[in-house]
Amino acid sequence: MNLKVNYAHKTNYNTGRTQPIKYIVIHYTANDGDTDEGNGKYFSQPNKNASAHYFVDEDSITLSVEEKNTAWHCGAAKYNHKYCRNNNSIGIEMCSKKDKNGKYYINELTVKNTIELTKNLIKKYNISVDNVLRHYDVTGKVCPEPFIRDEKQWNRFKKLLEEKEVEVIRYNNIDEIPEWGKKAVQKLIDKERFAQPNKLDLSYDMLRIIVLLNY
């Protein structure tokens, strides 16, 4: 897990906590192709009126607010959840992208990194998987949107938290391919090397081989 640090400005969170950590809240950034580093830099500036403990993308994670402090990631005037609040939770933001139809999605490597981070926090604070929530579950906000639009994605995420090893990543279309591999895969698609371009079924290792072979 490639962890970086870029602390949020002190005007964007509360120092300390009033309750022990019992929940982990999963968010998405609602941006198109942003990075954990970019978000870390943004929230290091004053008066953003929001924050999260971690930002995750496909190749690294940025710690923005220390876990001992209270990030402003799930506050609201009204709550759907009876107990989860900013002061007893850790907020994790997944960087997002848009497909060719303008719909948000979370890259599979970003999901994998988020799973790894969440598992570590579950173990560290003895948190039940049942207490890993979407922002939506806490306040009703449509976040993370892909995990609300497609409930199966959220169910899969929760299932992966309970597994000892994260399942093998599979890429099924060009939008899911990380930027470093898109050019090589697109060349193969253009040459009609795939019978079904929307069902590529490429593993991470297969993708690396394609790039290394310089297709």
What are these regions (language model features)?
Residues 19, 85, 103-111, 177-181, ...:
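Solvent-exposed, acidic/flexible segments
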Residues 83-94:
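Short coil-to-beta-strand
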Residues 166-215:
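Short, solvent-exposed alpha-helical surface patches in non-cytosolic proteins
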Residues 1-7, 17-18, 95-168:
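Basic/polar, cationic surfaces and motifs that engage anionic cell-wall
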Residues 26, 90, 132-134:
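Hydrophobic faces of well-ordered beta-strands that scaffold small-molecule active sites
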